[in-house]
Amino acid sequence: MWTADEIAQLCYAHYNVRLPKQGKPEPNREWTLLAAVVKIQASANQACDIPEKEVQVTKEVVSMGTGTKCIGQSKMRESGDILNDSHAEIIARRSFQRYLLHQLHLAAVLKEDSIFVPGTQRGLWRLRPDLSFVFFSSHTPCGDASIIPMLEFEEQPCCPVIRSWANNSPVQETENLEDSKDKRNCEDPASPVAKKMRLGTPARSLSNCVAHHGTQESGPVKPDVSSSDLTKEEPDAANGIASGSFRVVDVYRTGAKCVPGETGDLREPGAAYHQVGLLRVKPGRGDRTCSMSCSDKMARWNVLGCQGALLMHFLEKPIYLSAVVIGKCPYSQEAMRRALTGRCEETLVLPRGFGVQELEIQQSGLLFEQSRCAVHRKRGDSPGRLVPCGAAISWSAVPQQPLDVTANGFPQGTTKKEIGSPRARSRISKVELFRSFQKLLSSIADDEQPDSIRVTKKLDTYQEYKDAASAYQEAWGALRRIQPFASWIRNPPDYHQFK
């Protein structure tokens, strides 16, 4: 079928060949994050009895995004012409929506070959049965999936994170991290303390690299587990991992902050810093953001699909991801599963076509060459700070203007005087995707339009079109009735009233 390394290599090659120099990190000074959606197509005329692993497929990158930034709440605009969230995963998903709009235009308007085939109801389309989509990210999503234990070992290979840690509250900190000096040393990739630690990843040791730790302050809540000396009960012989005792000495931290008003992090030293399973918002520089963490958004996609409310008007079923592949980085299989699928497992009554997906989650052993870890290793003792790249790149598999490079939510190079004009809009901003949706709708004869639009009273604003996707809104309402999703931060209505 495909392997995690094949997906990663395809995305890295696409980044190097198809994306321009503009918007990429400055060598040896900046780093960025990468995400993409890969279309998987099973080859035709294969025997039905071929084992799944031997099925021949073609792989194609259909959307890609880079980026590390979010704007604060004070910079949000009611006109929908700014990107609030420019993390790579979100850029890739919005670029994917642009690709889906183009494919719907091919099918519904031009009657040309497309990823969609007619559905059973008038005006609706469904994904071809030989196609699926894999989501790739060079790193674990910010938020819950990035709360990963660091394990200290004596003379034993790298062990996977045990299920009990990943699914419950953090374990107690160990004595050697009580001292604040040692704690700071753990956050320094070059320190002796940090080099003693190895991540609990199933088969691979990640050396000389630690995740970027958050800067949240500590708070006085005790952890649930009374001892940091744990015994691995599930040795993974297939990966050559021996059983034995180990200690969780700290956690890789996420900068994403808990939703205001909800139970917060423990904030104790070492491994007791974070609570797991909570909704989080992305951090801002002094100005709080309204953007939920990538872990939370990806969990939502796994129930509602990646297409969003607008495109659901044209679809018989949501467009789900079949798998998520993560590049080489601090990683925990159990934390990923908890964050993306485990929090949605409570029984949900969902509309027809919607459901909690059994998402396949894998990690590649290939490191993204412009990741923070790779650039830090390459630059050695070079002077100056290593900083995240301020630009974001969007690429979609569409024939016209596939590239979009932004900074601070606007096309790179936009002047203050230009803000508010059409030229100052990203092609994947809310207002531009809405324009593409309206163009698609106006190109379809009235008697061929979907019932959700045809029989509804006159629709005008972005919010009205979203609300008219009744099945999608019903599914979203069902998800928000369970914890932790009841705490989801929603933008005020004024931000969705543009036309």
UniProtKB/Swiss-Prot annotation:
Residues carrying Phosphoserine: 191
Cofactor(s) demanded: 1D-myo-inositol hexakisphosphate
Listed Pfam families: A_deamin
MF terms (GO), sorted A to Z: metal ion binding; RNA binding; tRNA-specific adenosine deaminase activity; tRNA-specific adenosine-37 deaminase activity
Region (Disordered): 170-194, 212-237
Compositional bias segments (type: Basic and acidic residues): 178-187
PROSITE patterns referenced in this protein's UniProt entry, alphabetically: A_DEAMIN_EDITASE
Positions with a binding annotation for Zn(2+): 87, 142, 294
Active site: 89
Catalytic activity: adenosine(37) in tRNA(Ala) + H2O + H(+) = inosine(37) in tRNA(Ala) + NH4(+)
Cofactor binding notes: Binds 1 myo-inositol hexakisphosphate (IP6) per subunit.
Domain of life: Eukaryota
EC code: 3.5.4.34
Binding-site list for 1D-myo-inositol hexakisphosphate: 93-94, 297, 300, 430, 466
Enzyme class (EC, first level): hydrolase
A to I editase domain: residues covered: 63-498
Swiss-Prot/TrEMBL keywords: Hydrolase, Metal-binding, Phosphoprotein, tRNA processing, Zinc
Family (UniProt): Belongs to the ADAT1 family.
PANTHER family linked to this entry: TRNA-SPECIFIC ADENOSINE DEAMINASE 1
Role according to the record: Specifically deaminates adenosine-37 to inosine in tRNA-Ala.
Name assigned to this protein: tRNA-specific adenosine deaminase 1
Organism for this UniProt entry: Mus musculus (Mouse)
Lineage per the UniProt record: Eukaryota, Metazoa, Chordata, Craniata, Vertebrata
Gene name tied to this protein: Adat1
